[in-house]
Regions:
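Polybasic, lysine-rich low-complexity intrinsically disordered segments
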Residues: 16, 23, 33, 39-40, ...
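Residue-level signal for inorganic ion chemistry
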Residues: 103, 159, 178, 221, ...
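Conserved N-terminal catalytic core of the sugar/cofactor nucleotidyltransferase
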Residues: 46, 51, 58-71, 79-86, ...
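Conserved core of the sugar-phosphate nucleotidyltransferase
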Residues: 184-294, 298-301, 324, 374, ...
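Hydrophobic, low-acid, alpha-helix-prone terminal segments
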Residues: 8-15, 35
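Intrinsic low-complexity, disordered N-terminal segments enriched in polar/charged/small residues
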Residues: 21-24, 28
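Left-handed beta-helix
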Residues: 50, 63-66, 267-416
């Protein structure tokens, strides 16, 4: 039976076009034909119920054809070392043991509202083959390769100027590749609502999450409006990764949201912000004749060698006077630390988290054990430890010292 959408729409149009059309379908006394019709209607009902359950039908119909998605997949995730490392960062791993890598989950989620030809992936050039293996649906020309790690401002600039060359009327949704989302439909609804807002309002939109703790590893967004019922507000201040004292103050004030690293803007507006606040970067990338041509790889290699390591938060979001925030409510974690990993995972009766049934914990509490699946491990009489092994690196670290993990990754990287 053909259940493709065009066939179903054609069938529905026949049903709703009147009695005469229905009489042409339903033939009195023809039991075999009528059974086929009934079967098709039943299949149709179940098919439409499945679509409506996913909630994607209305979103797809309303999606602006000028909208693009940029998935940022160039980070190393060294706060999650050794499970996330330079050879295989966490976005390419199935860290939560759900059967799919983070980037695969991100693609499957966002591709419900964006066609493949309007999804771009930006990553380090050494990860191109991994992207092609894990996301074979994405055209090769939509994989943007960074020569050097230069943080989010250069990567967003690269994508913005490239997409502008393809479509000067474009809107871009920029998302991380390695975040956990518990409610896909609420997430997609917020993306659509943000796009609709930016189509009417000049400016930059970010999505904020209500904080659950005083976290120093996230950016904080202070909203101008104190009306909690308002979904979108203008941003008063934008602070990237505050110290603990400031984080405590932000958390206690109820005026701040976490920055989820999800941005929505028109290509014209973000390029104007680069001109205003990061003119050096604008000058480097404003050579559109070399983007979307065979000269692009050599051009990007030259440009990235001159780029500074700057985040979009510090380079633009903290400085711009045209920033808005949409309060998201879709269950979010960047899974960037072992603390965040512990919060997401199922625990045993002693608040321990492990990834394997070959790990035995006895008289131990509040531990995290993440080891290769065939590794037999016994943990006896210890509390609050992180025990993690991957690629011949074994780390045993007290959970209160988690902020030192980046040093370990750096030490072994330079030791080589």
């Amino acid at each position: 039976m053909d259940l493709r959408v065009p066939t179903l729409i054609k069938f529905l149009n026949r049903l709703k076009s009147g009695t005469a059309a229905w009489n042409n379908i339903y033939i009195k006394g023809n039991r075999r034909n009528n059974f086929r019709i009934l079967k098709k209607v039943v299949y149709l009902v179940y098919y439409l119920k499945a679509i409506l359950k996913r909630g994607t039908l209305n979103i797809q119909l309303r999606m602006n054809p000028n909208s693009y998605c940029l998935i940022m997949a160039g980070g190393i995730g060294n706060r999650f070392w050794p499970v996330s490392n330079r050879r295989c960062p966490k976005q390419f791993s199935d860290i939560l043991h759900c059967g799919k890598s983070f980037i695969r989950q991100t693609y499957e989620r966002i591709s419900q509202i964006f066609p493949n030809h309007r999804i771009f992936i930006i990553t380090g050039e050494e990860y191109e083959d991994i992207i092609k293996r894990q996301l074979p649906e994405i055209p090769d020309s939509n994989i943007l390769k960074e020569t050097y790690v230069r943080n989010t401002a250069p990567c967003i600039a690269y994508a913005a100027y490239k997409i502008k060359g393809l479509n000067p009327d474009a809107y871009i949704v920029t998302i991380p590749s390695d975040h956990f989302i518990s409610n896909d439909q609420a997430y997609l609804n917020d993306i659509q609502e943000g796009l609709s807002f930016i189509e009417k309002q000049k400016g930059l939109l970010t999505i904020g999450i209500t904080p659950t703790r005083a976290e120093t590893e996230y950016g904080y967004i202070q909203v101008k409006s104190k009306d909690n019922t308002q979904k979108i507000s203008q941003v008063k201040t934008f602070t990237e990764k505050p110290n603990q004292e400031l984080a405590n103050m932000f958390f206690d004030s109820d005026e701040f949201l976490w920055n989820a690293g999800i941005f929505i803007w028109s290509v014209q507006d973000i390029i104007q912000e680069f001109k205003t606040h990061m003119f050096d970067l604008h000058a480097l990338f404003n050579t559109e004749c070399k983007l979307n041509t065979p000269a692009e790889p050599a051009f990007i290699k030259s440009v990235y060698g001159q780029c500074h390591n700057v985040s979009i938060d510090v380079g633009i979001m903290e400085k711009s006077q045209h920033v808005y925030v949409l309060k998201g409510n879709f269950g979010w974690s960047d899974v960037g630390t072992w603390h965040a990993f512990h919060a997401l995972c199922d625990k045993d009766d002693h608040n321990n988290v492990t990834n394997s049934d070959k790990v035995v914990l006895n008289d131990s509490n509040d531990c995290i054990v993440n080891v290769p699946p065939r590794k037999n491990v016994v943990v006896q009489g210890v509390d609050n430890l992180i025990i993690a092994e991957k690629d011949n690196y074994l780390m045993i670290c007290h959970r209160k010292d988690e902020d030192k993990i980046k040093r370990f990754e750096k030490f072994f990287r330079h030791k080589k």
